[in-house]
Amino acid sequence: MDATNLKTRMNTKVQAMEAAPPEDLWNPSDSGYLALSSNALDLIKENLKQQSLSFQLFDLVKSPSGGSTVFSVPGLSGEEAEKELTGIILDYMTPRAYWATPDPVEGTPPTCLSKDSLISADGKVCAHCPFNDFGSKDGESNAKACKESVLLFLLRPGSVFPLLVRVPVTSKKLFLKYTTRLVSRLTPLSSVVTKITLEKATSREGKPYALFHFDAVEVLGSEEAEKVREFMDIVHAADVEPVFTEAD
């Protein structure tokens, strides 16, 4: 084969590759999730014996400190380091909490708590609270005294029980932006597989912290999406009273 013919064939192949449509993640597929392809739902109901789930039964992943880009995930042999978390976000909460003391002991219940960042446990409107103002936290410029976060219920491929992932306030807008992009495609949050990664960032005060990033990597098929809705019913029925600690 002469060089001219070879060059012609190579150019034809390159043009065909460029013309081919990219793989579309929005084409639904079966994800192979253990919880969605077995009798996991029946097993959970049988083992719980009609008892509601509580926060303490969920494994919790907190935001890493010091700008670390590695998650610490509870496992059977202790904490396991993972660079990313992939799963189906069944649901989420937007809690917030306030401590009257500047440095409470870890595990101390907050002075005030809200499950949705809108109304406190005693019925007050969070938007009208002075501790919701920027700069209200002592010793930190422009920080709020009332601590916000996002709590995700993440169903992972090899588990039949969702993992709780706490997203700090510094990444709250990034998560809400992600959910908004899904809405723009008329896609429920729970119908996609989400990948969560971390990026090191630095605050205006020079303190390192981790930014959360969210990407949709797969869309569930109709049968799996229906099973996800059944799992969501269990989460919604759970007695989830978020446990807050100052040292996240």
Question: What is each model feature region?
Answer:
Residues 49, 53, 180-187, 219, ...:
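Generic surface-pattern signal
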Residues 37, 78, 168-171, 175, ...:
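Intrinsic-disorder-associated interaction segments
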Residues 7, 41, 45, 176-183, ...:
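Generic detector of well-ordered alpha-helical segments enriched in charged/polar residues
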Residues 142-219:
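Extended serine/threonine-enriched, polar tracts that run as long, contiguous segments within proteins
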Residues 96-99, 204-248:
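Long, highly charged low-complexity segments enriched in Glu/Asp and Lys/Arg with interspersed Ser/Thr
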Residues 1-158:
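OB-fold ssDNA-binding interfaces and closely related basic DNA-contact patches used
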